[in-house]
Design a protein with these regions (language model features):
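Extracellular distal adhesion/interaction modules in secreted or cell-surface proteins
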Residues: 1-218
Length: 218
């Protein structure tokens, strides 16, 4: 709900939301829905953390989600977020088969505990938190997201540290990070359940057809 998860600052607390969209191949179809996540970042005093709200899975591969966290130039975390290195289908979508929430009709087909629903939670297995006062570097915090596919191949969503793993041979990114869209996602009976939402392309629909100006900018 908006009153529980607002973007903004209050005293020494702050929250921010992003949508991160991935291509799962070095030769992708540029629909950027192979894995889509909604991330909530939170600062409270000297503590910083995040949690992941899974949105869509348009990949037939075993996809694993990872993150790299920096404070300034100091890397404080790099790794996969799933317990036991479980893939995204297992960890986020209860092992549901097929494409999830990527259909051309834009109909939600995700099932949680056997019921079709568009709302998933920020999963406890994805939550991470650090006490930044223990890090000597006084630079800003940033998080760079990646997926692991095809064994140990890592594809990044616009990483400054892993540029060669962020762009394909055509110079197109393997992932997009969308911030502060001003849009929201509403679930019947629950109200607003996702802030700063991004309407990612449907299956086999290149992002160039949906957001031509964004594509030209890329």
């Amino acid at each position: 709900p908006a009153d529980e998860y607002p973007n903004g600052f209050a005293g020494n607390k702050a929250q921010l939301f992003q949508v991160v969209c991935f291509e799962d191949s070095r030769s992708g179809d540029y629909d950027y829905n192979d894995l889509v996540i909604h991330v909530k970042y939170q600062w409270s005093g000297t503590r910083f953390g995040f949690g992941v709200h899974p949105i869509a899975l348009g990949s037939t591969k075993e996809v694993r989600l990872g993150a790299v966290v920096y404070k300034g130039s100091t890397r404080i975390f790099k790794g996969l977020l799933a317990p036991g290195n479980a893939d995204a289908r297992t960890q986020y979508f209860q092992s549901q088969a097929g494409f999830i929430n990527t259909g051309a009709d834009r109909q939600i087909n995700q099932r949680i505990d056997g019921r079709v629903t568009g709302w998933n939670q920020y999963l406890g297995s994805t939550c991470r938190c650090w006490d930044l006062s223990k890090i000597a570097d006084d630079g800003a915090v940033r998080v760079e997201w990646y997926i692991q596919v095809d064994g140990d191949v890592e594809l990044y969503a616009l990483s400054t540290a892993y540029l060669n793993q962020s762009f394909d041979k055509q110079g197109r990114p393997y992932g997009l990070v969308i911030t502060q869209t001003g849009s929201s996602y509403t679930e019947d009976g629950k109200g607003v359940v996702g802030l700063d939402w991004f309407n990612y392309p449907c299956e086999n629909t290149p992002i160039s057809e949906v957001y031509p100006e964004l594509w030209n900018w890329l």
